[in-house]
Amino acid sequence: MDSFTTHILVVDDDDGIRSLVKKYLNENNYLVTTANNAEDAEEKVKIIKFDLIILDIMMPGKNGLQFIQENKKRIDTPIILLT
């Protein structure tokens, strides 16, 4: 992946973790979009083609594993799970 054109979705309910991951990725020239829950992430993947999704497993409401189960046929993007 070319970091100058790689678009990453970071999904985490913790503002601090989401901000930290975004800051690190931005400093390394990745384009980053964030979502604070699985429902917000689902809306974003409907309109944007991401190169990678970094996804928290434990979130209130729909968790990361439920997001994967419900979207695996529609999304072919690699996913990294955070715990």
Predicted regions and their residues:
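Non-catalytic signal-transmission and effector/linker regions of two-component phosphorelay proteins
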Residues: M1-H7
